[in-house]
Amino acid sequence: MQNRIMYKQYLQAGIFKVMQIDATRVAGPQEIVLEYLLANKFGVRVCPPHAGGVGLCEAVRHFAMFDYLAVSGQWDDRVIEYVDNQHEYFVHPTEIVNGRYKAPTAPGSGVDMKLEAAERYLYKG
């Protein structure tokens, strides 16, 4: 779904048992946070946003932390995707410890690319 209005309507209709946000379709971090809060209000658990693409694991790990620390306080029934490739292009790549994403230690979104990786794939047309 593309926005909080659609999520709210589906939540009001009782359609979801579990909600998984697509971080690439919604309007940024604020929208994702709002969708977590809406789901919590309606008693629907959220699995963190899809992480199946270049840089998406780095981008969505923060939302899993936000859910645990500020919304649900739950780890037990939360599942997050992990794609084990192309992390070498990022300054702060995602790390997995004991089957869980390791909390980021640097500020920011976590999707800062290494300069050499950006230059390698830069369109030179």
Kindly give the residue locations of the regions a language model identified:
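C-terminal extensions of enzymes
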Residues: 87-125
